[in-house]
Amino acid sequence: MDIVAHTLWAAAGATVIHRRRPLSRSTVLVTLVLAALPDVIHLLPIASWWLFADGSFDALWAYAVAVPGQEPGVPPLVGSLSHHLHCVMHSAPIAGLFTLALWWVRRTFWIPLLGWWSHIVIDVFTHSADYYAVPVLYPFTERGFDGIAWITPWFMALNYTALAAVAVWLLMSRKRPDRG
């Protein structure tokens, strides 16, 4: 799924949670950042190549919006680092270990992790074998589930229609101050 949709779904989820358990603005903000982060962090090696070596912004942009098989050429190390960062950030075992470690330290579940978890779960089903299947069981395997590619036009329309419907529902169902 695209970064904007990930962030909007996380915002909807945070709104629902906030209605039952008040969340601070910083908690919501970190949740939204973690919902987008898996699709951003793997660009760091390419951005570093552009900023500190002989890469270009055009290559970074082309990589960010590439479709399978049309990625720009990058140095092997840069490509490998980017690939493995993508795998790490979309891995349920790694997110699970991180969640357990944080739970052990804090003795409670850290709500912003729901942003990361929502990203992983959504991406498992919204990427196809032909469109960057998500390696949800990395590092045990790099294979992914063959879902529906989020970039498929009818699916994008359905996704944003669903987001709009959820937004309307959230607005219509919010508690209004008693004016009586």
Model-derived features with residue positions:
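N-terminal membrane-targeting hydrophobic helices
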Residues: 1-180
